[in-house]
């Protein structure tokens, strides 16, 4: 009887340990929405960034350029990444709003920090904290970490350079504000703009990275670490 009790206790402990391990290693589901003009979204986001994020072993990324499918995909997603500049219909806008207002995380990459949607001003006000309407020509820019204490900048060099579009990103004073983590500096004019930042929101974690035009950023180690850190920060 004593042996049976010990066996049952050991089995129960095994089940508890297994359950805890499974909970700790749960793969989080990410929806990444790309598509639009001026960029090879499928190659550099749907393939390269997806590979970078999934290399952590913690995430499963579904990439789509079908914006009509956003409401369906968000029903099972844990985190949303937007990197598109193509239209999003009213149903998609409503689904994204509901998703974020319920406290789910949002990561905005490159094209998604633009003023893309005139019919959805609340997007830039509430989720971007401003936006970009122009950029410098494609050329080498300096990226400078200005908040080295933040989780998103851990392991990132204090300065790193690559060829990209320097977005002239302007914060909106009517928004709840952003916290700038990395700035991009023009080698041509010395002008500086937010390169990576978090957006203040009462319910959700939101972060943004403004660079990401082509392989020169997506395959750069600093960019890849910044991307992974941003996803980790939002997910946790």
Predicted segments, located by residue:
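Bacterial Sec-dependent N-terminal signal peptides
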Residues: 1-25
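Extracellular ligand-binding/catalytic regions of CAZymes and related secreted enzymes
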Residues: 24-28, 54-55, 72-75, 188-191, ...
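Helical hinge/lid and interdomain linker segments adjacent to catalytic or ligand-binding clefts
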Residues: 24-33, 37-115
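A glycine-rich, often tryptophan-bearing local segment used as a flexible ligand/cofactor-contacting loop or short
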Residues: 33, 86-155
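Short, solvent-exposed loop/turn segments at secondary-structure junctions
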Residues: 37-38, 87, 113-114, 186-188, ...
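Residues at alpha-helix caps and immediate loop-helix transition turns in enzyme cores, especially N-
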Residues: 42-45, 92, 119, 193, ...
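Catalytic beta-strand/loop cores that center a nucleophilic Ser/Cys/Thr
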Residues: 51-54, 60, 76, 134-210
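Oxidoreductase and adenylate-handling cofactor-binding alpha/beta cores
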Residues: 123-128, 160-177, 222-236
């Amino acid at each position: 009887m004593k042996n049976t009790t010990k066996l049952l206790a050991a089995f129960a402990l095994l089940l508890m340990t297994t359950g805890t391990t499974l909970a700790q290693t749960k793969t989080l589901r990410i929806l990444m929405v790309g598509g639009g003009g001026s960029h090879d979204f499928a190659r550099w986001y749907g393939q390269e960034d997806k590979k970078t994020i999934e290399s952590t072993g913690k995430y499963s990324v579904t990439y789509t350029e079908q914006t009509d499918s956003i409401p369906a995909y968000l029903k099972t997603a844990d985190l949303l990444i937007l990197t598109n500049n193509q239209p999003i219909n009213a149903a998609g806008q409503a689904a994204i709003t509901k998703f974020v207002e319920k406290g789910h995380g949002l990561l905005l990459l490159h094209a998604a920090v633009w003023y893309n949607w005139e019919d959805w001003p609340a997007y830039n006000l509430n989720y971007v904290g401003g936006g970009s309407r122009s950029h410098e020509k494609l050329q080498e820019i300096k990226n400078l970490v200005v908040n080295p204490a933040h989780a998103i900048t851990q392991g990132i060099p204090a300065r790193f350079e690559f060829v990209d579009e320097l977005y002239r990103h302007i914060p909106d004073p009517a928004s709840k504000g952003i916290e700038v983590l990395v700035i991009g500096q023009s080698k041509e004019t010395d002008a500086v703009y937010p390169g990576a930042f978090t957006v203040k929101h009462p319910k959700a974690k939101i972060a943004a990275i403004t660079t990401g035009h082509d392989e020169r950023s997506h395959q750069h180690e600093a960019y890849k670490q910044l991307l992974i850190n941003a996803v980790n920060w939002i997910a946790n």
